[in-house]
Curated annotation (Swiss-Prot):
PANTHER family found in the cross-reference section: TRANSLATION FACTOR GUF1 HOMOLOG, CHLOROPLASTIC (PTHR43512:SF4), TRANSLATION FACTOR GUF1-RELATED (PTHR43512)
One Pfam family from the record: LepA_C
Protein name: Elongation factor 4
UniProt-listed Enzyme Commission number(s): 3.6.5.n1
Gene: lepA
GO cellular component: plasma membrane
Length: 600
């Protein structure tokens, strides 16, 4: 196969702009799938991907296409995840391509995540050309959207392909553009093997399957290969391509995209962005851009039924097989029992994992409030990182605490700007800029503490803007902040699962809301229950759940006041004793309340 007949490309699009449907049409047109095999969103393998209409893992497929110039071309479509949490995975998938189709919904225009991914593509020197999808919709405004693409992204859009993936309009034109506009890969088949690993997953029969793009050299069955970041060697047991079902091939040469199965046991060894080379004759310099993915958001997962603990552990281990960016370790809580502390890339990643646990493994879970990674500088000069309030050292040992900040860019219709600005200010944001992209669309850029974003920022942004705003963020740095640990005390006992790290300025308001919410949820006992929010020894808010009491004076018709007083005193004594020995059962809702306390 000649290297100049290969085209490697990916499709960049915002959620719901029609990326997976377009991929379906390309598969159908090039005859990769028969009518019988065709199902909607063929490349999205997980039910969850189909349902939410998002792509979570990268997939590849090889198409063969006879172009108008009479030549046969091999087109490798690399399907990338489009969501902000998976930015690193996207950048590695894009590094495997020479070009990209920018698919924009002709009725909605350019969105924040599209923009982030286009910039990633441009950073990787990809040839990007625009495709306007959904032109069959009555609300489509192709001219306005073309103008937006030119204004916002700076791409020439006058000859953008008009398409409707649903109706199959424009599919052939797109294939022709791919052949004409995207350059063939460059690479030397005779050089030592150098290949980019851009995705991996676990198959229970064959071990870890890795997707690679060969940059230089060739790899064939039986070769000894090495992964550069770990230095471990394996034997290539199978070499092949997805067309779109797995098919073995004799070898993969420079410029080609395919899969390798090499008896790798653990997906954590096959790191995305790693370089694959020959063990005996390695390449001199590995590929650049590799970095270890670290979880940014942490949350505790506990089974509601403690008998499901083992099942939860097995389920987490299974998910980890396919997702090395997810981490978990056991933890115990006095209030919730045994569970796990899990680390995620971001909020969407967290939601997807929780939903998969509940759906695929039938588990009922309680999730504690999400937290981020803080850096605590201690007085003795060392720095420790913590993910939960319970790991915070005593106040007298702490010099200062740093928290992570992100740079958020929010795209929104202009009528919602006021609401978004006040939301960002309330979340301790620092305004960077406000840019009018078109007379009706605005881009707002803010620096925000990640701690404030993980709780409910995204939901509130969507409700303020009726779902029209889109959010994209990147991690900036760590900054010094006045953070404190707030404890919730029930009858003087701190409840570990309810502690949280919070900014001092907000602690009073949050504490007050929390204790009043808890007062509604804790059922009345035979003795009074005192709920307090405290920072260190200082109580900042308090509520009391009054005791239930029997009417002890019912049997005294008239009689002396001292008799009544004696009975009341006796009852009071009894209640006091009870309070010392009684313990309060906290209902499950009390923990969920913490997650749902809206900051006023």
């Amino acid at each position: 196969m000649k290297i100049d007949t290969i085209r490697n490309f990916s499709i960049i699009a915002h959620i719901d702009h029609g990326k997976s449907t377009l991929a379906d049409r390309l598969l159908e047109y090039t005859g990769a799938l028969t009518e019988r095999e065709m199902q909607d969103q063929f490349l999205d393998k997980m039910d969850l991907e189909r349902e939410r209409g998002i792509t979570i893992k990268a997939q590849t497929v090889r198409l063969t296409y006879r172009a108008d110039d009479g030549n046969d071309y091999i087109l490798n479509l690399i399907d990338t995840p489009g969501h902000v949490d998976f930015t690193y995975e996207v950048s590695r998938s894009l590094a495997a391509c020479e070009g990209a189709l920018l698919v924009v919904d002709a009725s909605q225009g350019v969105e924040a995540q599209t923009l982030a991914n286009v910039y990633l593509a441009i950073d990787n020197n990809l040839e990007v050309f625009p495709v306007l999808n959904k032109i069959d919709l009555p609300a489509a405004e192709p001219e306005r959207v073309k103008h937006e693409i030119e204004e916002i992204i700076g791409l020439d859009a006058h000859d953008a392909v008009m398409a409707s993936a649903k109706e199959g309009i424009g599919t052939r034109e797109i294939l022709e553009e791919i052949v004409k506009k995207i350059p063939p890969p460059e690479g030397d088949p005779a050089a030592p093997l150098k290949a980019l690993l851009f995705d991996s997953w676990y198959d229970q029969y064959q071990g870890v399957i890795i997707l690679v793009r060969v940059i230089d050299g060739t790899v064939k069955k039986g070769d000894k290969i090495q992964l550069v970041s770990t230095g471990r060697s394996y034997e290539a047991l199978k070499v092949g391509v997805f067309a779109p079902v797995m098919r073995e091939v004799p070898q993969l040469a420079a410029g080609e995209v395919g899969f390798l199965i090499a008896g790798i046991k653990d997906v954590a060894d096959a790191k995305i962005g790693d370089t694959v080379t020959h063990a005996l004759k390695p390449c001199v310099t590995p590929l650049g851009g590799f970095k270890e993915v670290k979880p940014m958001v942490f949350s505790g997962l506990y089974p509601i039924d403690t008998a499901q603990y083992e099942q939860l552990r097995d389920a987490l281990a299974k998910l980890k097989l396919n997702d090395s960016s997810f981490s978990f370790e056991p933890e115990t809580s006095l209030a919730l029992g045994f569970g796990f502390r899990c680390g995620f890339l971001g909020l969407l990643h967290m939601e997807i994992i929780q939903e998969r646990l509940e759906r695929e493994f039938n588990l009922d879970l309680i999730t504690t409030a999400p937290t981020v990674v803080y850096k605590v500088h201690r007085i003795k000069g060392d720095v420790i990182t913590i993910e939960s309030a319970n790991q915070l050292p005593p106040l007298q040992e702490i010099d200062y605490i740093e928290e992570p900040f992100i740079l958020a860019s929010i795209h929104t219709p202009n009528e919602f700007v006021g609401g978004i600005l006040s939301l960002c200010e309330e979340k301790r944001g620092v305004q960077r800029e406000i840019k009018y992209l078109t007379p009706t669309r605005v881009m707002i850029i803010y620096e925000l503490p990640l701690n404030e974003v993980v709780l409910d920022f995204y939901d509130r942004l969507k409700s303020i803007t009726k779902g029209y705003a889109s959010l994209d963020y990147e991690h900036l740095n760590y900054r010094r902040s006045d953070l404190v640990r707030m404890n919730i005390l029930i009858n003087g006992e701190a409840v570990d699962a309810l502690s949280l790290i919070i900014h001092r300025d907000k602690a009073y308001y949050r504490g007050r809301d929390l204790v009043s919410k808890m007062k509604e949820l804790i059922p009345r006992q035979m003795f009074e229950v005192v709920i307090q929010a405290a920072i260190g020894a200082k109580v900042i808010a308090r509520e009391t759940v009054k005791a239930l009491r029997k009417d002890v004076l019912a049997k005294c018709y008239g009689g002396d006041i001292t008799r009544k007083r004696k009975l009341l005193e006796k009852q009071k004594e009894g209640k006091k004793r009870m309070k010392n020995v009684g313990n309060v059962e906290l209902p499950q809702e009390a923990f969920l309340a913490i997650l749902k306390v809206e900051e006023k």
